[in-house]
Amino acid sequence: MAAVSLRLGDLVWGKLGRYPPWPGKIVNPPKDLKKPRGKKCFFVKFFGTEDHAWIKVEQLKPYHAHKEEMIKINKGKRFQQAVDAVEEFLRRAKGKDQTSSHTSADDKNRRNSSEERSRPNSGDEKRKLSLSEGKVKKNMGEGKKRVTSGSADRGSKCLKRAQEQSPRKRGRPPKDEKDLTIPESSTVKGMMAGPMAAFKWQPTATEPVKDADPHFHHFLLSQTEKPAVCYQAITKKLKICEEETGSTSIQAADSTAVNGSITPTDKKIGFLGLGLMGSGIVSNLLKMGHTVTVWNRTAEKEGARLGRTPAEVVSTCDITFACVSDPKAAKDLVLGPSGVLQGIRPGKCYVDMSTVDADTVTELAQVIVSRGGRFLEAPVSGNQQLSNDGMLVILAAGDRGLYEDCSSCFQAMGKTSFFLGEVGNAAKMMLIVNMVQGSFMATIAEGLTLAQVTGQSQQTLLDILNQGQLASIFLDQKCQNILQGNFKPDFYLKYIQKDLRLAIALGDAVNHPTPMAAAANEVYKRAKALDQSDNDMSAVYRAYIH
């Protein structure tokens, strides 16, 4: 893009990296965010995403002059929402100007007409006016006394009764009032709040819950679709209590039982995502004495109202971990509205524990580091039971210093951890591990069905395998699932199929054949077609018997 003459407050199209040009506004940067050295650049707040970044002047174009051109190039839904947000911003700004001008004109007219009406025409009218004014003043004085006296009595009684009945914290609206409020669009609301609105990262002051665990700072969790499943592990070790505001708080029920070999870090820990793995991880972090703040995306997906966002968790914590299902969820968590990137400031740390491809994790690392943050990828090998038991295997790559800072956290959640070098290495290794595991599971299911159709005992086959070189906890558990017909998820089938797909793509990228993984992937795809996605990976067995 060609260089243009721009100034503070201008609406622009800004291009950041490989992303398409996006509408934004030039604003003042926060005080703690230094301007990068080198070429001239402006600090731009983007519409629709509520994101912001330093953009070189040659990557900027005036909004109005290039609006039609940009709209023709970009057709995405989020892009259209961003353009709508700009237009809404302009309409409101224009309406505000018109309202102020009309108001001043109307006030002037009202004053003039009032002066004309109040001007008496004769001495008699003056006397009549004086007498009537005296009566009015007298009546008003008596009425005022009565009203003031009655209002004061009623007011003091109401105030006293309200103070006795209401346990709410001062300054917070009650839950019922919150529910009745129609929320304004977050995008437009953020834009109309002023240039610095997105940069206020101050945490909301909250009073500590009575008898709360001192290691637990505050909990940002709303209800989910399946609380009994999602939080089964965490609620065994934690007690849930409702705060007066209606938000849910968690404190460790056995926080005193801290492992003597683990000295918890004094850093504030954030955790985003409480799925099968996340619940157990958070439970163990709390048990070992860490200060934890959590947020779960499921409630937001269902349309529930969350008091806080991933951005605020990141801004109030020193190290924030995230564990979500797939590359799209990982990107949305970081780059979406009120996402992780909004809370990143110099020195803030982000650890992504999701199993994703190397390209995705590299992209996330770049945007986090570009904001002055520190990044570590740390996908975990294991299942729900191992997560609950604190026996996961952690594969880390990226910032070595951050890896060391996470030492006590990794000890709490896993039995061992590996540092694999630069960002992307852990993602590749994790996909290879899960490729082997997924292919092995498909082979187990194939063997059991072959035993059945040839008249052999499946239980005897399992006994033989358990006495041989293939004996393992994984083999025994998955075979027991199949024999008992119990496919309660310990590792979702849809996720192992996703990992197989990503592993095959990894092989394709380096021209390496993966025929075994490809064959296993087809079996899992058939199982998904049979509605087994949300069952355990061992439900792949059903793909062979249908």
Curated annotation (Swiss-Prot):
Annotated spans, Disordered: 91-187
Site feature (Required to promote KDM1B demethylase activity toward histone H3K4me1 and H3K4me2) residues: F216
InterPro entries, per the entry: 6-PGluconate_DH-like_C_sf (IPR008927), 6PGD_dom2 (IPR013328), 6PGDH_NADP-bd (IPR006115), GLYR1_PWWP (IPR035501), HIBADH-like_NADP-bd (IPR029154), HIBADH-related_NP60_sf (IPR051265), NAD(P)-bd_dom_sf (IPR036291), PWWP_dom (IPR000313)
Residues with PTM Phosphoserine: S130, S166, S533
DNA-binding region residue numbers: 167-179
Pfam families tied to this protein: NAD_binding_11, NAD_binding_2, PWWP
Any single GO CC term annotated in Swiss-Prot or TrEMBL for this entry: nucleus
Region annotation (Interaction with KDM1B) ranges: 215-224
Region described as Dehydrogenase domain: spans on this chain: 260-546
Alphabetized SMART domains for the sequence: PWWP
Cross-link Glycyl lysine isopeptide (Lys-Gly) (interchain with G-Cter in SUMO2), where in sequence: K135, K175, K178, K200, K210, K226, K236, K239, K268, K301
GO molecular function, one term: NADP binding
Residues binding NAD(+): 270-284, 355, 498
Region of interest called Interaction with histone H3, as start-end residue ranges on this chain: 213-216
Entry text on domains: The A.T hook DNA-binding domain is required for the interaction with MAPK14.
Functional description taken from the UniProt entry: Cytokine-like nuclear factor with chromatin gene reader activity involved in chromatin modification and regulation of gene expression. Acts as a nucleosome-destabilizing factor that is recruited to genes during transcriptional activation. Recognizes and binds histone H3 without a preference for specific epigenetic markers and also binds DNA. Interacts with KDM1B and promotes its histone demethylase activity by facilitating the capture of H3 tails, they form a multifunctional enzyme complex that modifies transcribed chromatin and facilitates Pol II transcription through nucleosomes.
Oligomer status and interactors: Homotetramere. Interacts with MAPK14. Interacts with KDM1B at nucleosomes; this interaction stimulates H3K4me1 and H3K4me2 demethylation. Binds to mononucleosomes. Interacts with GATA4; the interaction is required for a synergistic activation of GATA4 target genes transcription.
Family note: Belongs to the HIBADH-related family. NP60 subfamily.
Identification of the protein by name: Cytokine-like nuclear factor N-PAC
